[in-house]
């Protein structure tokens, strides 16, 4: 049976949530949550390991982006679920070359609708991710390869402007 990336994202979110509440590391938390279906699917495990590895390796950088775009909000005041959805989506946007940023943002919004305790969470997640995405795009920090992954006309325009 094919494992869908949404299922993996949800498991990673649950692992991130667990480490916020318990004294454990992300690998242990994730290990408890993986189903046999995911473990048996090499593509699922590749995506899982890549995404969780990106989050682990770049958590402080990702958190800096979140902090810069959550005006008047201390990171400790952001709901744990929302904060971890933002972390996961930003890791995808920044480090998963084969996933279009809009897919990462849409997945984050849908996961927020499912897991967050308030309807406003999905709007909050959308607003923060959109602002960060626009900054990253303007700064030329999104490196995606392949058809449909990024608007290359905007990237070329930015490249031409910076080379002047």
Swiss-Prot record:
Gene3D superfamilies: NusB-like (1.10.940.10). Pfam families: NusB (PF01029). One of its GO terms (cellular component) is cytosol. GO terms for biological process: DNA-templated transcription termination; transcription antitermination. InterPro entries: NusB-like_sf, NusB_fam, NusB_RsmB_TIM44. Keywords: RNA-binding, Transcription, Transcription antitermination, Transcription regulation. GO terms for molecular function: RNA binding. Coiled coil: none annotated. Belongs to the NusB family. Involved in transcription antitermination. Required for transcription of ribosomal RNA (rRNA) genes. Binds specifically to the boxA antiterminator sequence of the ribosomal RNA (rrn) operons. This is Transcription antitermination protein NusB. It comes from Chlorobium limicola (strain DSM 245 / NBRC 103803 / 6330).
